[in-house]
């Protein structure tokens, strides 16, 4: 007997709708960054900077709503949440950094490393969450490595930089030629954030 296909609309829960809000904010922020590069209108970038904290709010709320509605568990929830987080807290902050001047060869390496670490961290969590869960409550007691939404701190840092005019050729700490390419030291913040995400020894209690 053929298996019934999974109806996405019927499977969606209120928590899933909030997760889609998270992904939508991140996606629109990416497009706004691209439009800012073309048009140079600062309002576009301010809107992008606003949407990423809004994505974080959606991310927090979807978990809260899911816990309130335990009777209706989403079959899509965990994967949908991870994919949305990759967009809003991985790709979007990296695009934002590139938009504001991190365009040297080593900068791009750091931005790519950051995104790859975020993807890897979420994949590890999805695979190991059952093993890390408490036997009585079924809840994961701690995060291995920093959660990817902590990248919002980088977004806030870049918002301050944009506010005070320390972007593009005026980025803090300047730029240096390292071998075949240029590096802005600010890009190392992305590399550090990525490394913290994939750390196996850094354990953060889960609220």
Task: Locate predicted features.
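C-terminal membrane-associated helical module and adjoining short loops/tails
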Residues: 1-3, 135, 139-207
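Topogenic membrane-insertion module of multi-pass membrane proteins
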Residues: 1-60, 200-202
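Interhelical loop and helix-boundary elements at the membrane-water interface
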Residues: 2-23, 64-83, 124-150, 202-207
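Multi-pass membrane catalytic core of lipid/isoprenoid biosynthesis enzymes
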Residues: 16-20, 24, 46, 67-125
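Hydrophobic alpha-helical transmembrane segments of polytopic
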Residues: 18, 48-55, 110-113, 117, ...
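Alpha-helical transmembrane segments of polytopic integral membrane proteins
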Residues: 27-30, 54, 58, 63, ...
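Helix-coil boundary and interhelical linker segments in multi-pass alpha-helical membrane proteins
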Residues: 28-50, 87, 93-112, 157-185
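Transmembrane alpha-helical segments that form the membrane-embedded catalytic/substrate-channel core
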Residues: 59, 115-128, 188-205
């Amino acid at each position: 007997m053929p298996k019934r296909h999974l109806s996405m609309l019927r499977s969606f829960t209120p928590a899933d709708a909030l997760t889609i809000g998270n992904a939508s904010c991140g996606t629109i922020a990416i497009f706004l960054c691209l439009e800012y590069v073309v048009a140079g209108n600062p309002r576009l970038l301010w809107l992008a900077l606003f949407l990423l904290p809004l994505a974080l709010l959606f991310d927090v709320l979807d978990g809260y709503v899911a816990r309130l509605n335990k009777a209706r568990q989403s079959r899509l929830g965990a994967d949908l949440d991870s994919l949305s987080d990759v967009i809003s807290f991985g790709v979007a902050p990296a695009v934002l950094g590139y938009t504001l001047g991190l365009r040297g060869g080593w900068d791009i390496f750091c931005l790519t490393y950051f995104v790859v670490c975020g993807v890897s961290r979420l994949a590890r969590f999805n695979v190991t969450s059952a093993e890390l869960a408490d036997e009585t409550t079924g809840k994961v007691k701690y995060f291995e490595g920093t959660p990817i939404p902590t990248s919002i701190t980088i977004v806030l840092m870049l918002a301050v930089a944009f506010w005070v005019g320390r972007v593009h050729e005026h980025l803090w700490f300047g730029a240096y030629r390292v071998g075949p390419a240029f590096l802005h030291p600010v890009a190392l913040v992305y590399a550090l954030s990525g490394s913290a995400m994939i750390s196996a020894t850094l354990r953060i209690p889960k609220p």
